[in-house]
């Protein structure tokens, strides 16, 4: 009943060397041909001979470590060369055996693997030393390690097996060294495991590290998980029974597995959800492994028709696999007080989810095994796959070059290598952390950008311009991809909670002091805000975060003894309106004063649609509708303003827009699944689908809410649905 984290140890603490060796030989005999087993046994005997009487700090024979490492590799379905290298991976480093000796006995391929793992270990230690005073081992450490291993994914997998065994027996080291290794494991090796798709290994590495680094929160989180497990045990059992009955009634062959979220992952989500474990939608999960992709979608349709589904958590990784080839359908159902995530996948997909990239080779020496897709095998076996391509595929990014200068150092241009997903603000903080809060402008190729929400591009010329006063904006946090920099900016904002607010009066007063000014009294503030149509000071402070005020008009406006404050009304209104439009996706409308644009959800409005989009101006707020929206009938003499999409903003800050459609047509057993699959394959995000099915009349009706890029994408999706031999008509909602 209880979640026993000790199961994360792959081997019993009581298992002896003899028992582990017996288990290892049995499993190799089951998975490999006799001639391959002979090679592995040769490596085992060689490793045992040279490690001899060496002992671990636990008092165990040292040889038990490479043996357990190799056993993990067998269980992870790695090839014989990698298993042999696992047995031999410490030979060169810890004995008198040389690289030449190893090559003469076991050949170049096995020796190269041993050497590469040694290089990864060396690079890891080097990075540990370089980063020992930093808060985080960032992705650049991963770059160096991935590059050092060239295209050998199996070298990384071998290193993960090595590290997993070491972290499992870490208690024999000094406490300080435990923490250093655990920190590196959590921030580096667990990330690598996740990036190459070995999620169970990632969980083990993260949880074992977490227990060392923060035992108090580890135990608290474990206790909360167990409390939830006990509290909802009956509900959990009833739900599984319902699922099994539904599957059997529909004659679907399946295997059902259940899992509870890892402890460290749960702790991270508890931090985000303010310690409310009930808000974690995937704490409990059921995996349903079926025979085919068609069964996956058939089962998805059954679940959505028979249970209450939380569509915002629906994800189809079959139609859109992850970078590491992970495929599965995730959907979440709501029970009585309990959310349960259901993962639907085929047997091959399940194999990939457990072993990641390690599962994608086809080995002739294996007696049996699952075949990877031709695409995966061709990619991984390609002679063209250089280390840079390998890194990009696994880690989802690449390295680009940018040229950076600042107005404080006008004659100095810094050439910088950054990750391709770096934002301009990431680069600004990395180079100018002390001046970052005073950043006023950014220029690209000499032209000032209208929004700081820009991703760096190769060979981009960037200039940062700084002012004299604090210009930090709350929204900047959304414009940064580097989570370490983002956390530091949060600290600068003096807010560690989820909603970081720069709109606090003390910060405004501090900015006034820097200009030798004082805040006006309450009566003066009220009078001046009324002139802007603003009721509260807090509202004003929120609004001034967005615009750029070249002459600090927003500060002088509320300064005491400023008799010319009325002269500032017009430029402030202009700046506020301009900022609102610049942070929207519409062309600026001259001559109107607005403090907010609200895209209403009552009707569909997407870029490039032929229908006219309009704004209704009400109390300085521009509310966006479709020209024939039914809600307009309720408005009394509305001030209607035609709006036009801003192509530049859509290009610079791409996003998806809410689209609501109604589809009606001829129903069949596969209709709903085909439509859902087509929508997701069209690179859209499906939020909600409400089906109405009349089987007697063979009719269906779907109300669908999804997020898409533009009208062209919507039309493409609808045309694709037509190719599925579905008879239907559709309209906007």
Swiss-Prot record:
Q: Which reaction does it catalyse?
A: guanosine 3',5'-bis(diphosphate) + H2O = GDP + diphosphate + H(+)
Pathway given for this chain reads: Purine metabolism; ppGpp biosynthesis; ppGpp from GDP: step 1/1
Tell whether Transmembrane helix is among the UniProt keywords. no
Record carries keyword Manganese: yes
Domain of life according to the entry = Bacteria
The residue ranges of the HD domain are: 62-167
Cofactors: Mn(2+)
The record's SMART domains line, in alphabetical order, gives:
HDc, RelA_SpoT
Q: Which GO terms describe its molecular function?
A: guanosine-3',5'-bis(diphosphate) 3'-diphosphatase activity
Going by the UniProt record, its keywords in alphabetical order are: Hydrolase, Manganese
Give the EC class as a word. hydrolase
What biological-process terms (Gene Ontology) are attached?
guanosine tetraphosphate biosynthetic process
Q: What Enzyme Commission number does this protein have? A: 3.1.7.2
Q: Which family does it belong to?
A: Belongs to the RelA/SpoT family.
| Function summary | In eubacteria ppGpp (guanosine 3'-diphosphate 5'-diphosphate) is a mediator of the stringent response that coordinates a variety of cellular activities in response to changes in nutritional abundance. This enzyme catalyzes the degradation of ppGpp into GDP. It may also be capable of catalyzing the synthesis of ppGpp.
- Which protein, by its recorded name, is this? Probable guanosine-3',5'-bis(diphosphate) 3'-pyrophosphohydrolase
What is the protein's species of origin?
Mycoplasma pneumoniae (strain ATCC 29342 / M129 / Subtype 1) (Mycoplasmoides pneumoniae)
Lineage at the top is: Bacteria, Bacillati, Mycoplasmatota, Mycoplasmoidales, Mycoplasmoidaceae
């Amino acid at each position: 009943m209880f979640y026993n984290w000790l199961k994360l140890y792959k081997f019993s603490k009581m298992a002896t060397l003899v028992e582990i060796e017996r288990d290892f030989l049995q499993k190799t005999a089951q998975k490999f041909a006799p001639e391959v087993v002979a090679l592995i046994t040769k490596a085992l005997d060689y490793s045992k001979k040279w490690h001899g009487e060496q002992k671990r700090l636990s008092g165990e024979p040292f040889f038990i470590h490479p043996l357990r490492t190799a056993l993990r590799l067998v269980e992870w379905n790695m090839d014989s060369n990698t298993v042999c290298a696992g047995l031999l991976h410490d030979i060169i480093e810890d004995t008198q055996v040389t690289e030449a000796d190893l090559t003469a006995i076991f050949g170049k391929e096995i020796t190269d693997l041993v050497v590469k793992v040694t290089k990864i270990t060396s690079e890891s230690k080097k990075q540990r030393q370089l980063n020992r005073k930093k808060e985080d081992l960032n992705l650049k450490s991963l770059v160096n390690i991935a590059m050092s291993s060239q295209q050998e994914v199996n070298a990384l997998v071998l290193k993960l097996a090595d590290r997993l065994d070491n972290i499992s027996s870490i208690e024999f080291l000094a406490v300080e060294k435990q923490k250093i290794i655990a920190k590196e494991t959590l921030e580096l090796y667990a990330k690598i495991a996740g990036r190459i798709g070995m999620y169970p290994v990632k969980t083990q590495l993260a949880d074992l590290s977490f227990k060392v680094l923060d035992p108090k929160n580890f135990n608290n989180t474990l206790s909360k998980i167990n409390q939830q497990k006990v509290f909802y045990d009956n509900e959990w059992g009833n739900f599984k029974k319902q699922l099994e009955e539904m599957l059997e009634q529909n004659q679907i062959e399946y295997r059902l597995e259940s899992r509870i979220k890892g402890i460290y992952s749960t702790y991270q989500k508890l931090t985000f959800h303010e310690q409310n474990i009930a808000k974690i939608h995937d704490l409990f999960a059921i995996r349903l492994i079926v025979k085919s992709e068609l069964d996956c979608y058939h089962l998805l349709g059954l679940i959505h028709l028979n249970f209450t589904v939380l569509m915002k958590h629906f994800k189809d990784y079959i139609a859109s696999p992850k970078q590491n080839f992970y495929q599965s359908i995730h959907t979440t159902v709501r029970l009585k007080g309990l959310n349960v995530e259901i993962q639907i996948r085929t047997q091959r997909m399940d194999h990939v989810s457990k072993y990641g990239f390690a599962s994608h080779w086809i080995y002739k020496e294996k007696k049996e095994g699952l075949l990877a897709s031709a695409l995966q095998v061709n990619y991984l076996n390609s002679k063209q796959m250089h280390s840079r391509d390998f890194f990009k595929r696994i880690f989802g990014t690449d390295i680009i070059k940018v040229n950076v200068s600042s107005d404080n150092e006008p004659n100095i241009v810094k050439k910088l290598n950054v990750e391709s997903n770096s934002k301009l603000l990431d680069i600004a903080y990395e180079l100018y952390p002390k001046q970052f809060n005073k950043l006023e402008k950014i220029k690209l190729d000499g032209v000032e950008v209208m929004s700081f929400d820009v991703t760096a591009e190769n060979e981009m010329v960037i200039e940062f311009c700084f002012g004299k006063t604090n210009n930090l904006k709350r929204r900047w946090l959304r414009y940064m991809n580097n989570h370490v920099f983002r956390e530091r900016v949060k600290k600068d904002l003096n807010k560690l909670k989820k909603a970081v607010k720069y709109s606090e009066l003390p910060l405004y007063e501090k900015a006034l002091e820097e200009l030798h000014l004082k805040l006006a009294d309450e009566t003066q503030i009220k009078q001046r805000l009324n002139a802007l149509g603003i009721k509260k000071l807090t509202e004003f402070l929120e609004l001034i975060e967005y615009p750029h005020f070249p002459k600090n008009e927003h500060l002088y406006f509320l300064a005491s003894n400023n008799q010319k404050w009325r002269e500032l009304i017009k430029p402030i209104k202009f700046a506020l309106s301009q900022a609102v439009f610049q942070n929207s996706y519409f062309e600026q409308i001259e001559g109107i004063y607005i403090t907010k644009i609200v895209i209403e959800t009552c009707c569909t409005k997407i870029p490039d649609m032929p229908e006219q989009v309009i704004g209704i101006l009400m109390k300085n707020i521009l509310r966006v509708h479709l020209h024939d929206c039914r809600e307009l009938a309720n408005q009394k003499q509305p001030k209607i303003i035609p709006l036009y999409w801003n192509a530049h903003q859509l290009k610079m800050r791409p996003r998806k827009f809410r689209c609501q459609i109604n589809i009606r047509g001829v129903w069949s057993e596969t209709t709903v699944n085909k439509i859902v699959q087509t929508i997701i394959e069209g690179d859209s995000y499906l939020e909600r689908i409400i089906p109405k099915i009349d089987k007697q009349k063979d009719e269906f009706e779907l109300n669908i809410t999804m997020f898409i890029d533009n009208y062209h994408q919507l039309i493409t999706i609808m045309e694709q649905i037509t190719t599925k031999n579905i008879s239907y008509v559709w309209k906007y909602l």
